Amino acid sequence: MIFDIFSSSLRGASANCRYPEKKTIRNAEDLKEAAGFDHVAVEFKDSYRSRKNFIASDVVVMDCDNGDTDNPDDWVKPEMLQDMFPDTAFAVVPSRNNEKEKDGKSARPRFHVYFPIKKTTDERAYTQLKRR
């Protein structure tokens, strides 16, 4: 499993729109290191995050915050993903708010799932894929 993400040197900077550092992810250690910084799954023109600046992507990221229910029995946990996505390659990284209270919600599993895809340069197709 190989894919690229683009990062900044910042952590938790929600107003940041620049992601100039390309990181090729080849293994768990690469992803762990890169995910420690703010990052995106898309290469953007001039490294500036904007739909109109979309160049390409080879990975789709799904955020799982378990925000739909307060019932722990209904929460999705990383160990459940293999059964949910059989025969699908993916990588999981805990979010920085994993098992912490957030936005008035109790501590719960919060994580990101990275699904490598065939590289696309079609922003509309990529956006549709993310909405599935």
Model-predicted regions and their roles:
Residues M1-F111, F115-R131:
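Signature for HUH/AEP ssDNA processing cores
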